[in-house]
Amino acid sequence: MQLEPIDMRFGVVRKEDYSISVRKCHKKVLSTRQFSRRAKASVAFIVKRPGCIICKEEGLMLRELVQSFPENRVAAWAVVKEIDVDNDGLTALYQNYFRFPFFLDRKMKLYKAMGKNVINRFKFFYNIRKNGARKRIADKGIEGTFIGKGEGLILGGVLIFDAKGDICYAYQEKSGAEELPIEEFRCALNAIIADQESN
């Protein structure tokens, strides 16, 4: 399973000319100057559609979660399905909500490994109303629309890795409109960190 690094540091989406495995993506993120090998775990944000406000909310929530751990104990990175479809949405997600490394999964192998669940459009719009997603997101100051550009039917999720690169926790979106279970993620990260520090 190969992913391609994406460089967005200067407001331009540029794919690198090489690909690396998921485990190497995790290791590459941990070795960056930002984390300086202090991270005991990493959070991989598997993005449904970068331009949609649900993904912006998820990026913001995951960024706040990662930053709540002291001394860069937790690293973060993201995976997208495509580029050059909504580069404005992708750049906005990176610059305003989730400023961590991004990787391209052109063949969607990571999405397939997570079950490749497809959104039920009726359920999605029903859950937006039922869960109060519109108000919840507006209260966080996030602007945009629920419909973005590009492929948005295959749901995303979150993977949590330990320092060795083993997946210790996986979460897949159910309807695409629910709020992330951040406290579950926090418990999983605390358990991973405690386990690694006790060894």
What are these regions (language model features)?
Residues K48, K81, A163:
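Cofactor-binding loop segments of dinucleotide-utilizing enzymes, especially the Rossmann-like FAD-
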Residues M8-S42:
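A short beta-strand-turn-helix
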Residues R33-Q67, A75-W77:
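Short active-site neighborhood of thiol/selenol oxidoreductases, capturing the structured segment around
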Residues P5, R38-A39, E71, L153:
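A generic fold-level signal
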Residues D195-N199:
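Cysteine/selenocysteine-centered motifs that mediate thiol-based redox chemistry or coordinate metal-sulfur cofactors
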Residues G176-I192:
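A short, polar/charged loop-to-alpha-helix boundary motif
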Residues E58-A113, I119:
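Structural microenvironment flanking redox-active thiols in thiol-disulfide oxidoreductases
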Residues D105-A177:
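Thiol/selenol-based redox catalytic cores and closely related redox-interacting motifs
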